[in-house]
Amino acid sequence: FVSVPVIIAAKSLKIPSIVHESDVTPGLANKISLKFAKKIYTTFEDTLNYLPKDKADFVGATVREDLKTGDKHRGYQLTEFNNDKKVLLVMGGSLGSKKLNDIIRQNLETLQESYQVIHLTGKGLLDNSYVGTKDYIQFEFVKDDLTDLLAITDTVISRAGSNAIYEFLALRIPMLLIPLGLDQSRGDQIDNAKHFESKGFGKTILEDTLTENELKTQLREIETNRDDIIKQMQTYKESFTRQDLFQKIINDALSE
């Protein structure tokens, strides 16, 4: 909502503004800003269905440039893992998810039959009783080393924020998405997750249906269909390079 007064002020000063919607369905701030903005760009093509045709353009996602520079050797050093077994990365979002953390730990022995597990728990949610456990390592949060961990990741369990899931897509990492529920959000992550599942990029479990059995079932589905999922991911191409998008912003802002 911080952007709304800025967009309104820009309009009053006759300064053109362009807003961006990263989720499938537009949020309230962008719905308000749209009345004063010249254009709105969307990450998802389906978002165009919710917006006026004369103002909305689909531009896709432009992921950060360093994403594909992760070092596998460094990733294995950080985790003390190896390439003998697949790596499962579990990300519960910046605040973590107690429910997801509990289910991962309760099913750790089963998961370890197929995976080495990197568990990003969220701040204050480490469990010291698991320190030193074979094929399992936990971090509260990882920033600078995340690209190295992604470089060794075969499958990811994650929330469904658009930036994160497009990064997994760019890296061709099959994903099991557990979006924030309606009790914690407006449902944007649910829409994002369902969209990605419909494209064949992975599977979705709603948080209120997250159980041990459902987790095992969906991970099994992903592994059974891994090759098909990756093939589907390979059909995705970025709509704009960073330079092309920069030029589009200039052209749209200056056009009459």
Annotated model-derived regions:
Residues 139, 151-166, 173-174:
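Acidic donor-binding loop of glycosyltransferase active sites
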